[in-house]
Regions:
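A conserved ligand/cofactor-binding region detector
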Residues: 1-171
């Protein structure tokens, strides 16, 4: 009941309460270089990342699948991975530079519930790039499993009104 009272008058443009900064979460993530480039813009978080690695595979863009070019895409990835291995033996620090935006890295991300609201508002919105949107939706789903009331109104800007109607039908 407390969270319903706290969120009763919230609007899509409102910041959530600062008290939610006391609720921390830690996520172990694997993501593409493209996704990481967007995620690291969220400064109210701690990100600890490993190097990109062919051993983590790649993220296949839906646009490549939509035009039926997965085979060609993966052939280029195979060539890239071969170049990576050649360079890695001579200059390990230079090898990651040959990898693509589709290659993945592991990331530990620590953030608080208030920042997760902010991340969800921007990155789970239908206008967000598909890769960061998918990652953000998975993070939000996992966090909601643990604290459903705390994150009851966390969603993309485009989904706020529908979510509000679910929890506050008379408002």
């Amino acid at each position: 009941a407390m969270f319903k009272t706290l969120f009763k008058h919230i609007q899509s443009y409102d910041a959530v309460l600062r008290e939610l900064e006391n609720v921390d979460m830690l996520f172990e993530l694997t993501m593409s270089a493209s996704c990481f480039a967007q995620l690291k813009r969220h400064r109210i978080a701690t990100l600890i990342s490993q190097d990109y690695s062919p051993s983590l595979g790649v993220t296949l863009p839906p646009a490549v699948r939509a035009i039926g070019r997965q085979k060609e895409f993966m052939a280029m990835i195979k060539k890239t991975n071969s170049a990576y291995e050649i360079i890695r033996h001579k200059s390990p620090g230079a090898a990651p530079y040959v990898l693509t935006n589709a290659h993945r890295r592991r990331v530990l991300m620590k953030l608080n519930a208030r920042e997760l609201y902010h991340l969800a508002r921007l990155r789970t919105d239908r206008h967000a790039q598909w890769d960061i949107r998918n990652l953000s939706e998975r993070m939000l789903k996992q966090a909601r499993n643990i604290m459903p009331l705390t994150l009851m109104m966390a969603c993309g800007k485009d989904g706020f009104d529908a979510r509000r109607k679910i929890f506050f039908p008379k408002a």
